Amino acid sequence: MGQCLGLVQIDQSTVAIKENFGKFSEVLEPGCHFLPWCIGQQIAGYLSLRVKQLDVRCETKTKDNVFVTVVASVQYRALADKASDAFYKLSNTREQIQSYVFDVIRATVPKLNLDDAFEQKNDIAKAVEDELEKAMSAYGYEIVQTLIIDIEPDVHVKRAMNEINAAARLRVAANEKAEAEKILQIKKAEGEAESKYLAGVGIARQRQAIVDGLRDSVLAFSENVPGTTAKDIMDMVLVTQYFDTMKEIGASSKSTSVFIPHGPGAVKDVAAQIRDGLLQANAERND
């Protein structure tokens, strides 16, 4: 923009307001214009057509009595075909826009709870934009876009909200941990049950093998040693198992103190108890 010898240069995205003896004459477009000052023609001012941005911070209170600071960002520009209105009708465009933003936000946010205000930021921005568009179009301005870029609660409220969120996340984590431990316990119990079942099967097979071996031993001994009875053979087997048991107990490093009769005569008592039990069982079966 410049003026020399009545020639005026107007830059791109800018218009100039031409007056003749102080009265509005016309809007000059970008380019070079001739204004003979001697006949009262002059430039009253310039108006940029670029998009401008205004950030407005508005403090208000929500429906649940929480004080918040709402930060709105308004993008606006002057209209070339209404440049005279934009130049003459408003003395301070930014203050005018700020006043309308304050009015709409303070009329909208108090109707919402804090959580709803966060969720409905776009609705608040739309309400502000509609009101600004309706009001500022009469002054030659266009509202390009309005955004609610932040809602800042009071510091103490923000800290409380963070603590609530942290507690909720800890509760979820605790539930997940408990569920995982529950699954581990179930799997462990299933494994122990399967292990005990297999151990029982193994013990049953072992005892069956022992019984089969004893039977074969008794039959073979009675055939090879004439004059022996089944009682003699069982007594000898019991003595052998008795000493094998004492040997295993003594050889084990994890065995505790076990007090059992150590004399060979104790085997006779054990054999007698076994025989008495078998005879009693047979008697009851015959009755």
Swiss-Prot record:
InterPro entries per UniProt: Band7/mec-2_domain (IPR050710), Band_7 (IPR001107), Band_7/SPFH_dom_sf (IPR036013)
Residues with a covalently attached lipid (N-myristoyl glycine): 2
Protein name in UniProt: Hypersensitive-induced response protein-like protein 2
Function comment: Positive regulator of hypersensitive response (HR)-like cell death. May be involved in potassium ion channel regulation.
Pfam families referenced in this protein's UniProt entry, alphabetically: Band_7
Keywords: Lipoprotein, Myristate
Annotated organism of origin: Oryza sativa subsp. japonica
Database matches in SUPFAM superfamilies: Band 7/SPFH domain
CDD domains assigned to the protein according to its UniProt record, in alphabetical order: SPFH_like_u4 (cd03407)
Top-rank lineage group of the source organism: Eukaryota
